[in-house]
Amino acid sequence: MGVQVVPIAPGDGSTYPKNGQKVTVHYTGTLDDGTKFDSSRDRNKPFKFTIGKGEVIRGWDEGVAQLSVGQRAKLICSPDYAYGSRGHPGVIPPNSTLTFDVELLKVE
């Protein structure tokens, strides 16, 4: 399946991140059963990463690149675009489809 992007709120419609650019996002990650496993919002600290550098799961590299600044969307990531058969011990079971509520705050 890869990553499915489901819009929640529109962005500026013109500023999309490109490979090599640093992005700042707020996110909440949930498992299929709705269990929240991580949230930058809960920490009140946005998360930064560079698009296309493999710093995050593939679903984020490809999904966040489809968002414009200010946009909020659900990124539904199949296991091969998330943590795969390994999962993330103690947090994410193996072969989990993950849903992230992501808001793109800034592109640098």
From Swiss-Prot:
Its EC number is 5.2.1.8. It is an enzyme of class 5 (isomerase). Residues 1-21 are annotated as: Disordered. Keywords: Cytoplasm, Isomerase, Rotamase. Residues 20-108 form the PPIase FKBP-type domain. GO terms for molecular function: peptidyl-prolyl cis-trans isomerase activity; type I transforming growth factor beta receptor binding. GO terms for cellular component: cytoplasm; cytosol; plasma membrane; sarcoplasmic reticulum membrane. It catalyses: [protein]-peptidylproline (omega=180) = [protein]-peptidylproline (omega=0). It holds the Pfam family FKBP_C. The keyword Isomerase applies. It is found in: Cytoplasm. PPIases accelerate the folding of proteins. It catalyzes the cis-trans isomerization of proline imidic peptide bonds in oligopeptides. Binds to ligand-free TGF beta type I receptor, from which it is released upon a ligand-induced, type II receptor mediated phosphorylation of the type I receptor. Binding is inhibitory to the signaling pathways of the TGF beta family ligands. Belongs to the FKBP-type PPIase family. FKBP1 subfamily. PANTHER family: FK506-BINDING PROTEIN 59-RELATED, PEPTIDYL-PROLYL CIS-TRANS ISOMERASE. This is Peptidyl-prolyl cis-trans isomerase Fkbp12. It comes from Drosophila melanogaster (Fruit fly). The gene is Fkbp12.
